[in-house]
A protein has these predicted regions:
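Cyclophilin-like peptidyl-prolyl cis-trans isomerases
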Residues: 1-235
Length: 235
């Protein structure tokens, strides 16, 4: 019996399309566990992507984004925080999912971001816990929406038009167990008994059987013995 871990999969639904991400259950168990718990509680339903920086990150997960006050977006979170979880196997590649936090390394709760391009300057300081496997075109579309910029300095990274996170659903990971199969019997060229190309071994056995039958007939059956002697005398 062999076992192989199948990672959890997150399905992130937005008004600009769907994003599918694989989660790093084994390398970031605390962070992934927190994310899955929130998703299963429908915590992420009907939020907004409140921070958008093209060629950097798109960010969501703040329950304050549900109200009509954009100035408090980015200040909220869930009731519990988790410690910073860093793995050398997880870096800020294009499409990486990471946990947003304050200046306190252990302050991450519910807000998360998706990288728009590689952002290795964040490595070691922010927890990566998954990677987009489908829907990077949606990530790019969100990253390219219009933001307020210099028109509203306090909302410079906030989109002018709302971009919605409808919900997050997770198919949780599991151990896949399969039966181990032993080595199969080798197929020998030339038939069951082998003998190389052309089946020479099988032919020799057939000749031996015919000779044996002939000998038995020779000694056991008088008429056959006489016939054989007659043939031999003619030769």
């Amino acid at each position: 019996m062999s076992r192989e871990w199948v990672n959890s999969t997150a399905y992130i639904s937005t008004n600009l399309g769907n994003i599918v991400a694989t989660l790093a259950d084994l390398d970031a168990p605390t962070t992934v566990g927190n994310f899955i718990s929130l998703a299963n509680e429908d915590f992420y339903d009907n939020m907004k992507w409140h921070r958008i920086v093209d060629d950097f990150v798109i960010q969501t997960g703040d329950p304050n984004s549900r109200d009509n006050n954009p100035y408090n977006d980015g200040t909220g979170g869930s009731t519990e925080t988790i410690p910073l979880e860093i793995s050398e196997n997880l870096t800020h590649l294009d499409g990486a999912l990471g946990m947003a936090r304050s200046s306190d390394p252990d302050s991450a709760s519910s807000q998360f971001y998706i990288c728009d391009g590689e952002q290795h300057g964040l490595d070691g300081n922010y927890a990566v816990y998954g990677f987009v496997v489908e829907g990077m075109d949606v990530v790019r579309a969100i990253a390219s929406v219009e933001v307020y910029g210099n028109r509203r300095p306090l909302l410079s990274q906030h989109p002018v038009e709302d971009v919605w996170l409808y919900d997050v659903e997770v198919e949780e990971g599991y151990w896949n167990e399969t039966e181990s199969t032993g080595p199969t019997e080798p197929v020998v060229p030339g038939g069951v008994l082998g003998g190389g190309p052309g089946g020479g071994g099988g032919l020799l056995v057939a000749v031996a059987v015919i000779v044996l039958v002939g000998l038995i007939a020779y000694w056991k059956v008088p008429k056959a013995r006489l016939l054989v002697n007659k043939v031999l005398r003619r030769r």
